[in-house]
Regions:
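A detector for small-residue-rich transmembrane helices and their helix-helix packing motifs
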Residues: 1-166
Length: 166
């Protein structure tokens, strides 16, 4: 954003309520996960992506992970667009939460629920839901919860089928 004086950040990598006649509204639903407010936020997300991403990719395949990232970006973008008309969202935290939950399915065997999944749900999603219930939650917590729920949906769905999707 510095080279373009913030234009790319605002117009490409940040989703917010804008007119449906603005053609940039549609790519923003996906591209907002590539924008970050600062380098520290980028670093914290990329480190987690680099740790859990390969596990999830090894188990479920690159095509499925790319689909999961795109759908998570779309869902979190739409949540903002519909429910937070005065808000703006950028960052990959929803995708990070989705991958954390999805990676916990990596060792899942048929008919079992991995202990790591239970712990991830209690620690990560439980904290986000607690913040939502106590009223201290905002858009960030909602995107984390959405990412975690999507990670569970993808994990349970793909763990039932055969491995692949590469």
């Amino acid at each position: 954003g510095k080279l373009t004086d913030g234009w790319t950040t605002q117009n490409l990598f940040c989703v917010y309520r804008s007119s449906l006649t603005d053609w940039l509204t549609y790519p923003r639903f996906f591209l907002h996960v590539l924008g970050h407010p600062d380098f520290a936020a980028y670093c914290s997300n990329i480190v987690i992506l680099l740790v859990v991403g390969p596990m999830a990719e090894e188990r479920f395949g690159g095509k499925r992970i790319l689909l999961a990232i795109a759908l998570t970006a779309l869902v979190t973008g739409l949540v903002l667009w519909f429910f937070f008309p005065n808000g703006a969202l950028m960052g990959a935290s929803g995708v990070v939460f989705m991958l954390i939950v999805l990676a916990s399915f990596a060792g899942m065997r048929t008919g079992t629920i991995p202990l790591t999944l239970i712990l991830v749900l209690i620690l990560y999603l439980g904290g986000e839901i607690f913040q939502a219930v106590t009223g201290s939650a905002g858009l960030a917590q909602l995107t984390h919860i959405a990412g975690g729920v999507l990670g569970m949906i993808f994990g349970f769905t793909w763990s039932r089928g055969k491995r692949g999707g590469r």
